[in-house]
Curated annotation (Swiss-Prot):
It comes from Mus musculus (Mouse). Glycans are attached at N170. GO terms for cellular component: collagen-containing extracellular matrix; extracellular space. Changing K94R: In RNA edited version. The keyword Zinc-finger does not apply. Transmembrane segments: none annotated. Residues 98-157 form the Kazal-like domain. May interact with VPS24/CHMP3; the relevance of such interaction however remains unclear. Interacts with CD93; this interaction plays a role in endothelial cells angiogenesis. Residues 27-113 form the IGFBP N-terminal domain. Induction: By retinoic acid. Expressed at high levels in lung, kidney, small intestine, testis and uterus and at moderate levels in liver. The modification Phosphoserine is found at S238. This is Insulin-like growth factor-binding protein 7. N-glycosylated.
Length: 281
């Protein structure tokens, strides 16, 4: 059997070498030897999101944050800060038809892996774990205590009064209402009490509506998340309905209250022209 010419074998071997992947060799050739002394200096005040390595894995560089460009090649995907990943941006991909034909590489941005709110040890809710970590690094740079994640989701907080009830003046037979808006996490439970004081000044409360036929209580969630709005409707108004009414909110983290007075008169001319601030008819 006749052997193939030596020139033909050499040509085939050369062709195989040309077909081999060149990514790893070309990458190492582009990077060259690592010389830490020649690495550019980092910012004087340090990196806000910590450090990572450059595309060659040699020089320290500042890690990139959410929404900042990253990537450009497989070796460059380590530029994002810990807890983030380099994801192609659909918005930036539009109009890049030339990229498939040897044009510029598709750009990408750093995106947080945990895209849900978290509660920090400082009692503040952060939109993501990445933003909590960034806040912790800023706190440490100021010499403050690091912030850690306490739980997933928003931080629990005691109730607070968003809109308190207002004092009311009106005549007997009228229809009046008090309203109160509260917020808290978990969502508070809102109740109404009528405050009574005896001759010695001792206060006691009567849970409403009780057995009053002319009084109704209504409560609904909102207008914002974890908010509750409640109303007391009195119709028809009588002298017995005069007094102090308390809006009381409570949850597992605490309680809050606000009060307003209903003053009942026989005729409109008995209502003083200058009432306390926030009073209404």
């Amino acid at each position: 059997m006749e052997r193939p010419p030596r020139a033909l074998l050499l040509g085939a071997a050369g062709l195989l070498l040309l077909l081999l992947p060149l990514s790893s060799s070309s990458s190492s050739d582009a990077c060259g030897p690592c010389v830490p002394a020649s690495c550019p200096a980092l910012p004087r005040l340090g990196c806000p999101l910590g450090e990572t390595r450059d595309a060659c894995g040699c020089c320290p560089v500042c890690a990139r944050g959410e929404g900042e460009p990253c990537g450009g090649g497989a070796a460059g995907r380590g530029h994002c800060a810990p807890g983030m990943e380099c994801v192609k941006s659909r918005k930036r991909r539009k109009g890049k038809a030339g990229a498939a034909a040897g044009g510029p590489a598709t750009l990408a941005v750093c995106v947080c892996k945990s895209r849900y709110p978290v509660c920090g040890s400082n009692g503040i809710t952060y939109p993501s774990g990445c933003q909590l970590r960034a806040a912790s690094l800023r706190a440490e740079s100021r010499g403050e205590k690091a912030i850690t994640q306490v739980s997933k989701g928003t931080c629990e907080q005691g109730p607070s009064i968003v809109t308190p009830p207002k004092d009311i003046w009106n005549v007997t037979g009228a229809k009046v209402f008090l309203s109160c808006e509260v917020i808290g996490i978990p969502t508070p439970v809102l109740i109404w009490n009528k405050v009574k004081r005896d001759h010695s000044g001792v206060q006691r409360t009567e849970l409403l509506p009780g057995d009053r036929e002319n009084l109704a209580i209504q409560t609904r969630g909102g207008p914002e998340k974890h908010e509750v709005t409640g109303w007391v409707l009195v119709s028809p108004l009588s002298k017995e309905d005069a007094g102090e009414y308390e809006c009381h909110a409570s949850n597992s983290q605490g309680q809050a209250s606000a009060a307003a007075k209903i003053t009942v008169v026989d005729a409109l001319h008995e209502i003083p022209l200058k009432k306390g601030e926030g009073a209404q008819l």
